[in-house]
């Protein structure tokens, strides 16, 4: 056919239906959609190889192998050309085998009696012995229409298959299944040689019409046993019996077409030097002749001693094959498989595909007549898997593919064993995750996630930051003692990982030099601290401070002459306002001596006591400066007595604390104060520090300069800081580009106890951060990034917390209350920190909350405005102004920006704003009462109470309640109508009569009391 062949055309050519071809293509691994689909040439060739060489079926008509109904003595003779051809056909021109399955096989020679064919009447017991086939392959075969006389109708149905105990005696009159058939003369058959018959390469013929279903119920009567003898009519075959016609498996290459006899190796002349008795030199196999054997896949395995199968079909004389019934054939199937000599199984089958030799219950695999081993059949039939042969392409089933796919998607099991600690101590940083915990105990993080979920009831991922409480509870659960590393220890470990250290003892080989003392001036607000420093420095810093109060930490170095020697002294000025507690604490930590300033006219105040506590906590000596001694009402002795209660005893009272009376305004006794500072430093302190090492110190203050960028005021504590050094301070790092002293002059290096302003940081350091010089910029950047990550993890752990029922309810309540969002911008980091702490301490009630969503140092930028617009926040600028077009953007976005220069003004305004956001509180105020004297029924209105106002005023549209016998009958009513006689009234005063309508409420009786009231707002305190 031209072009590609279609499935239905191939089915027509092969003589089978399209479903059979589609099924065969599917078995071959070729998936074709429908009968009208085209098939490629290689697939056609493979398909034809899988089918037997019967390219076309005979002309129409009833198949000759189907016996007619009735109980006649013998079956009807087959029609020429319609009988099935189970075996290879002879060469065209020679008479080929035409015996149908319903007729007996013609004897090929008198000395070679053949076995009964399937469906043929069995001969008498002497004649029922298996007869060998003809010894010569050149003997002419008999006519296809020759039928021997029927001797018994009982054997017409053939031997009934069925299991039989192994090793039992065979029934008389038939060959024992599984045993070799003896040749004539009683001699044992010779073993097959290498040139003997071998398994056939193709499966046996299969009927063209449905009928080989092994599960079809037979419609014919029960067949008699194979051991019965006698003559009788042949019983009709069951619906499942094989019918003649083409069978699956394409024609073999070179096979002739339909209609002519097929060439048979048995009909060819013997090869020279071959043995007599069979083609190829091998003696013919006993059991009669037969065509190609059915495929072993079409049979169910049978025990070795099973009953014999159905008799095989007749075949050309001289061909090895099954004349007798092959063991193990299922009823309704094809002929039995031929049993090879010496192999267990049934009797010689009528020929079939290459079944597995030696399989229990079946005959040996069919072999070709000529020498040489044939290919084993691989096609799986309806009765079992294919036989041994060349392995075909293996395809995974859909179930196997799905299981493989699902196994790939299967999540890793988290049920791994978690090691127990047995009291072992492990150290974890703040905000550590379960992955960090797992690294410490060498466990699977997924297992810890499961433990936290199942035993602690928390849903935490492996990389999520956990609170300290969660980590400690997990440690108790697993038997570990979890120690949360403090920030100081964590930072120390971080520096040690880079072979760095901060602080520590000096080595013996380190050269120490004298350094100036660091003096911190502390005290209550407005007690004259900055004015005293101005007197020492001969400057006027107070005039530059907004509101006359110090809001920054200032560091200065002055030179004082004591006993003729000029001694440098470093002064640090701290704010005295209560909001700058953190600044005072930092000032006390970095100082050598604390000068406590107390006003002689004001005495000891709260911030005075706080500053004293900071100094005592830092363990530094204290010098008391009693200021404002020139004012009226000054009492320095009172100050000495008050401070005695806090452990500061003056020298004149027998103590060790130096008290100096000074006047900062008049610059009185300033030299005495400096002398007291130097004497205290020399007596109590070892003022030496190394100068040849890398610089280390503390950042006192930080700010963002518009032209210079981040600027940090640092105090060098050891070593020498030089321009070009790589430094890291907290989460900020950079390279020193320039250094400025307190007067704004450029300096190239700064030794111990020298305060300088450093330019070159990438961001503004926080006040109080330690700074140190590192070998290179890369190390500084890595240290800063790790500190940022550590701080971020700690903040995340604190913000998340444990999701318990209480916290969920609290968050729901927070969602209901009003919140004020703020963005803080200041000139220096210390001021921003102080402002944030002060604002967060404001408490006006649970209904309103304060949230600071961002804070920073420097001018107000457009980014701050956009963030405030997105979060409905107010921008607070402390000593800063907008930058660029931030003002225009704020006006366009409707963002409110407030500017402050004094911190307590900002605190007061924010507190008032929070109070204004409180929800109003209402209380009930009684307006008046009216007594019901009469009840009138008004159409379309209802009952109207004719009343007398007893007290107050009755107003229309006010709330009312009805009281009967002192009991409230109805509440939350409304005075919908109010009339004075026939006129509508807005209000009726005491002593007047009126008509009151309460809307749809009509349960009004005489002597009831109508009380009116309203809700009035109560001012919040």
UniProtKB/Swiss-Prot annotation:
Compositional bias segments (type: Gly residues): 57-71, 275-291, 306-389
Major localization listed first in the record, in broad terms: cytoplasm
Stretches assigned to the tr-type G domain: 514-686
G3 as annotated region, ranges: 573-576
Region (G4): 627-630
GO molecular function, one term: GTP binding
G1 as annotated region, ranges: 523-530
Region described as G2: spans on this chain: 548-552
Database matches in InterPro entries: EF-G-like_DII, IF2_II, IF2_N, P-loop_NTPase, Small_GTP-bd, T_Tr_GTP-bd_dom, TF_IF2_bacterial-like, TIF_IF2
UniProt organism field: Frankia alni (strain DSM 45986 / CECT 9034 / ACN14a)
Role description: One of the essential components for the initiation of protein synthesis. Protects formylmethionyl-tRNA from spontaneous hydrolysis and promotes its binding to the 30S ribosomal subunits. Also involved in the hydrolysis of GTP during the formation of the 70S ribosomal complex.
Region (G5): 663-665
Pfam family name, one: EF-G_D2
UniProt biased composition (Pro residues): 75-95, 113-129, 198-208, 234-254, 262-273
Organism lineage: Bacteria, Bacillati, Actinomycetota, Actinomycetes, Frankiales
Comp. bias (Basic residues): 390-401
GO cellular component terms listed in the entry, alphabetical order: cytosol
Name listed for the protein in its UniProt record: Translation initiation factor IF-2
Protein localization: Cytoplasm
Keywords: Cytoplasm, GTP-binding, Initiation factor, Nucleotide-binding, Protein biosynthesis
UniProt: GTP binding residues: 523-530, 573-577, 627-630
């Amino acid at each position: 056919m031209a072009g590609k062949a279609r499935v239905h055309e191939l089915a027509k050519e092969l003589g089978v239906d399209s479903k059979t071809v589609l099924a065969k293509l599917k078995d071959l691994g070729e998936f074709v959609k429908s009968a009208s689909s085209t098939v490629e040439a290689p697939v056609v060739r493979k398909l034809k190889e899988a089918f037997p060489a019967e390219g076309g079926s005979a002309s129409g008509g009833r198949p000759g192998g189907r016996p007619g109904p009735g109980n006649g003595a013998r079956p009807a003779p087959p029609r020429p050309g319609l009988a099935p051809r189970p075996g290879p056909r002879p060469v065209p021109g020679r008479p080929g085998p035409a015996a149908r399955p319903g007729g007996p096989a013609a004897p090929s020679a008198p000395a070679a009696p053949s076995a009964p064919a399937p469906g043929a009447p069995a001969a008498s017991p002497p004649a029922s012995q298996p007869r060998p086939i003809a010894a010569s392959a050149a003997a002419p075969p008999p006519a296809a229409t020759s039928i021997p006389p029927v001797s018994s109708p009982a054997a017409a149905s053939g031997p009934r298959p069925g299991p039989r105990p192994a090793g039992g005696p065979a029934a008389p009159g038939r060959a024992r299944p599984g045993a070799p058939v003896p040749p004539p003369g009683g001699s044992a058959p010779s073993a097959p040689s290498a040139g003997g018959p071998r398994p056939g390469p193709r499966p046996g013929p299969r009927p063209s019409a449905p009928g080989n279903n092994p599960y079809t119920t037979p419609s014919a009567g029960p067949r008699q046993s194979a051991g019965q003898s006698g003559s009788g009519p042949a019983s009709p075959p069951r619906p499942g019996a094989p019918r003649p016609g083409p069978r699956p498996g394409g024609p073999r290459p070179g096979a002739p077409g339909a209609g002519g006899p097929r060439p048979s190796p048995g009909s060819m002349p013997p090869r020279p030097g071959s043995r007599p008795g069979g083609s190829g030199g091998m003696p013919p196999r006993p059991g009669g002749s037969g065509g190609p054997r059915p495929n072993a896949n079409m049979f169910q395995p049978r025990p070795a001693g099973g009953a014999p199968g159905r008799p095989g079909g007749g075949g050309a004389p001289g061909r090895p094959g099954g004349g007798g019934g092959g063991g193990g054939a299922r009823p309704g199937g094809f002929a039995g498989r031929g049993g090879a000599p010496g192999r267990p199984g049934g009797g010689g089958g009528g020929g079939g595909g290459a079944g597995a030799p030696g399989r229990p219950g079946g005959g040996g695999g069919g072999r070709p007549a000529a020498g040489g081993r044939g290919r084993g059949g691989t096609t799986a039939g309806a009765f079992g898997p294919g036989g041994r042969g060349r392995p075909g392409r293996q395809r995974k089933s859909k179930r196997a593919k799905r299981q493989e796919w699902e196994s790939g998607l299967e999540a890793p099991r988290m049920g791994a064993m978690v090691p127990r600690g047995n009291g072992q101590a492990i150290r974890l940083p703040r905000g550590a995750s379960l992955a960090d915990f797992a690294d410490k105990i060498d466990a699977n993080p997924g297992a810890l996630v499961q433990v936290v979920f199942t035993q602690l009831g928390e849903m935490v991922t492996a990389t999520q930051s956990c609170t300290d409480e969660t980590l400690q509870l997990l440690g108790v659960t697993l038997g570990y003692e979890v120690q949360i590393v403090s920030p100081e220890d964590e930072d120390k470990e971080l520096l040690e990982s880079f072979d760095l250290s901060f602080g520590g003892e000096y080595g013996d080989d380190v050269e120490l030099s004298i350094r100036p003392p660091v003096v911190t001036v502390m005290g209550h607000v407005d007690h004259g601290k900055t004015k005293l420093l101005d007197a020492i420095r001969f400057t006027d810093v107070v005039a530059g401070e907004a509101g006359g109060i110090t809001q920054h930490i200032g560091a200065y170095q002055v030179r004082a002459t004591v006993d003729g020697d000029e001694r440098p002294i470093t002064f640090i000025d701290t704010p005295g306002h209560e909001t700058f507690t953190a600044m005072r604490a930092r000032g006390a930590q970095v100082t050598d001596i604390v000068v406590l300033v107390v006003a002689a006219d004001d005495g000891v105040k709260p911030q005075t006591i706080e500053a004293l506590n900071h100094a005592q906590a830092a363990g530094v000596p204290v010098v008391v400066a009693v200021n404002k001694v020139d004012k009226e009402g000054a009492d320095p002795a009172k100050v000495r007595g008050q401070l005695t209660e806090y452990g500061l005893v003056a020298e004149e009272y027998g103590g060790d604390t130096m008290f100096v009376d000074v006047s900062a305004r008049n610059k009185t006794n300033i030299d005495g104060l400096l002398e007291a500072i130097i004497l205290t430093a020399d007596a109590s302190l070892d003022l030496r520090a190394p100068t040849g090492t890398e610089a280390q110190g503390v950042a006192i203050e930080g700010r963002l300069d518009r032209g210079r960028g981040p600027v940090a005021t640092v105090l060098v504590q050891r070593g020498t800081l030089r321009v070009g050094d790589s430094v890291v301070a907290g989460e900020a790092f950079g390279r020193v580009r320039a250094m400025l002293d307190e007067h704004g002059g450029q300096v190239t290096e700064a030794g111990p106890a020298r305060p300088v302003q450093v330019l070159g940081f990438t961001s503004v350091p926080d006040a109080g951060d330690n700074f140190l010089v590192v070998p290179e910029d890369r190390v500084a950047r890595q240290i800063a990034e790790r500190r940022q990550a550590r701080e971020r993890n700690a903040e995340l752990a604190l913000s998340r917390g444990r999701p318990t029922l209480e916290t969920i309810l609290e968050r729901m309540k927070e969602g209901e209350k009003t919140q004020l969002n703020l963005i803080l911008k200041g000139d220096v980091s210390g001021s921003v920190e102080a402002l944030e702490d002060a604002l967060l301490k404001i408490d006006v009630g649970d209904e309103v909350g304060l949230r600071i969503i961002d804070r920073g140092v420097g001018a107000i930028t457009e980014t701050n405005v956009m963030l405030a617009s997105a979060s409905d926040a107010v921008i607070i600028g402390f000593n800063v102004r907008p930058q660029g077009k931030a003002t225009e953007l704020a006006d366009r976005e409707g963002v409110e920006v407030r500017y402050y220069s004094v911190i307590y003004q900002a605190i007061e305004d924010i507190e008032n704003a929070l109070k204004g956001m409180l929800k109003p509180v209402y209380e009930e105020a009684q307006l008046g009462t009216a007594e019901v004297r009469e009840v009138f029924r008004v159409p379309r209105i209802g009952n109207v109470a004719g009343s007398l106002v007893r007290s107050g005023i009755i107003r229309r549209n006010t709330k009312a309640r009805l009281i009967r016998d002192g009991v409230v009958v109805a509440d939350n009513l409304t005075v919908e109508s109010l009339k004075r006689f026939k006129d509508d009234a807005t209000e009726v005063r005491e002593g007047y009569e009126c008509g009151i309508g309460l809307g749809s409420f009509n349960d009004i009786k005489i002597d009831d009391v109508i009380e009116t009231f309203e809700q009035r707002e109560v001012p919040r305190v």
